[in-house]
Amino acid sequence: HRNKFEKRGFDRVIDVWGADHHGHVHRLQSALDALGLDGSHRLEIVLMQLVRMMQGGEVVRMSKRTGKSLTLSDLLDEIPVDAARYFFNSRAAETQMEFDLDLAVKQDSDNPLYYCQYAHARICSLLRKMEEEGVTVPEQADLTVLSEEEELALVKQISLLPEEIIGAAADRDPSRLNKYAVALCAQFHRFYNACRIKEAEDEVRDARLVLCRAARQTIYNVLIMIGVEAPEHM
């Protein structure tokens, strides 16, 4: 840490530790204070609660003493990389996580990652089909024609992304992006089920297509920030 502050010019250092090391936080900050590096203010330590693995509704028992453990390599033999990244990012640091191995591989709406990736693929499919049927998906449209409750709610949800990014960074809580992604996809599905697109008048249809494009791009952006793929086909 001294090297980071003195030699490498860091203004602030953020360490991520397991909660079982909480007793060392004050010691390290005090040591940096003694070196004149203002560790109490410039060193921030985020304590992560431990993860409890679940499978078949039961806890997967692990023990350092007996040597029974589950490594990340072992985990990735059981579930996709995307699932590991999404689920590990789905809880705030101070919240204990129950990692459901069965849920992580489910391919239905119970799995939040599948739910979000499916929403992205669904919009991609919709836009492709419109183009195949001779309907040009416009870059811009008059969005003032959107007046349905589900349309306006989707517009509002899309607009919240910058605020969520800033909040996630300020709170050191990237799980906010997971929650936002699920809320956005849920709102898109409500919009899609309530508002006809192909059969609508041209002006309304174009506005709804632009809204779909905006939703797709926003879902894509969030999934990429979380570190998972945004598939166009599922």
Give residue spans per PLM region.
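Non-catalytic interaction-recognition regions
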Residues: 1-234
